[in-house]
Amino acid sequence: MKNTIATFQEFKNKGKKISMLTAYDYSMAKIIDESGINGILIGDSLGMVIKGEEDTLSVTVDEIIYHTKSVKKGAKNALIVSDMPFLSYHTSVEEAVKNAGKMIKEGGANAVKLEGGASVIKQIKAIVDAQIPVMGHLGLTPQSVNAFGGFKIQGKSEEAAKRLIEDAKLIEDAGAFAIVLECVPKKVAEIITKEISIPTIGIGAGNECDGQILVYQDMLGMFDDFIPKFVKQYANLGAQMREAIQIYIGEVGEGSFPQDKHSFKIDEKELQKLY
């Protein structure tokens, strides 16, 4: 059954946990979707895990749309959420609505996600008014990595925690259907989760959030350039993939692959005509 923003709200109301993962292509989206995930985020994290960049800042709207199209074809039941990249909504309300609309109309997303608190409330309201569901994002917002001075936990002081709580309430009032809380102290995330009526999706924010999200390469052990503290690796596919590829290389080198069962045959009579 197709997950919707109503499904997410129903889960929160009933105390059921929401599960989300990232995806960027058809094949992986299909596997994730068939596993029963509630939501898939086409994250600007693709800048790091797909493009090999050091951060997410270079990702463009067109790149998000391209990957959203691929994910959409593979995921039939998950809620599809597309990240709004750096500077795709910051410059003006009009630009924010235009780019959000492109992700829905051209990419096929069900919703968009954007980072920030009080500074982006006008954008959130305008996008919601355009009938586009919005997921907020507070805490460690990767697009603000330069402003934060690196990838650091947020909300550790009383002042910073109060600001996060207030921002969460503002985002809810603006009409967002959910909020991602990234790298926020567990107790602060718990307070936010209790004080707002929309779902919170945690990533490095403890288990009191209404749901969780991870980058699939992280949780499957496929990306070892950097492993965040909040990641649990449920498999070590990177090592398994390298081993499989090395076996393939060895079999090609010794001529044991392909075998007859991997090859096609020609009728013996037709073959004789070639000599």
Swiss-Prot record:
3-methyl-2-oxobutanoate binds at D44, S45, D83, K113. It comes from the Bacteria. Disulfide bonds: none annotated. One of its GO terms (cellular component) is cytoplasm. Keywords: Cytoplasm, Magnesium, Metal-binding, Pantothenate biosynthesis, Transferase. It is found in: Cytoplasm. GO terms for molecular function: 3-methyl-2-oxobutanoate hydroxymethyltransferase activity; magnesium ion binding. Homodecamer; pentamer of dimers. Belongs to the PanB family. This is 3-methyl-2-oxobutanoate hydroxymethyltransferase.
